[in-house]
Amino acid sequence: MKFVCSLIFIWLSSLTIFANDKVLIDYSVADSLKVVNLLEAVKSIGSDEPLPVFFGKQFLGVPYVSSTLEIGDYERLVVNLHQLDCTTFVENVTALSICVRKNYSSFSDYCKILKKLRYWGGEIKNYTSRLHYFPWWGLDNPKKGFITEVSCGDSMFSATQVLSV
């Protein structure tokens, strides 16, 4: 009987873990507080500084570490603001900027945006559903309305410049 009760408890606990959009989120309390504090701090900046610049500056001095999203045997949303690589830096700065533009101020809102940015179609299925490379990131996120492609169109821009050396 004790064994059956334990199994039921574990099953109910797992429902709670996956209840929020069926996503397990791996984060520290320090990282969740940092998100909320950054979303609060941005309210005091002037309108002259672009949001991505403001948030990017907040990560100066954060160590560059690779493979910070590879935790455990299954894919989950990882929030790690105390170690970044090139892609996670851009993802975090972008997610924070989008939160401000949408008037979001909670860690939960931030996680929803981060999940949409980081995964094909905004859905976590497995390791292969993560946008591992910037070209992939640039293909999927315009469809979500998060970024806009800026290009020269069909013709390449060319100009002649004379240098005096």
Which residues does each predicted region cover?
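Acidic/His-rich structured neighborhood in mature extracellular/periplasmic domains
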Residues: 59-165
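Cationic-aromatic interfacial patches
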Residues: 21-88
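Bacterial Sec-dependent N-terminal signal peptides
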Residues: 1-22
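Generic hydrophobic, helix-prone segments enriched in Leu/Val/Ile
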Residues: 2, 35-38, 42, 114, ...
